Amino acid sequence: LECNKLVDIAYITCPAGKNL
């Protein structure tokens, strides 16, 4: 999954570095 602030699930599964 890609980092997406609009999608909590995708956002959580993203690497911590990409969460920013």
UniProtKB/Swiss-Prot annotation:
**What is the protein named?**
7.2 kDa cytotoxin RVV-7
Q: Which residues form a coiled coil?
A: none
**Keyword entries, A-Z:** Membrane, Secreted, Target cell membrane, Target membrane, Toxin
Q: Which GO terms describe its molecular function?
A: toxin activity
Tissue expression per record: Expressed by the venom gland.
Q: Where in the cell is it found?
A: Secreted; Target cell membrane
Quaternary structure, from the entry = Monomer. Homodimerizes during storage at 30 degrees Celsius (observed after 3 days).
Protein's organism: Daboia russelii (Russel's viper)
**Which family is annotated?**
Belongs to the three-finger toxin family. Short-chain subfamily. Type IA cytotoxin sub-subfamily.
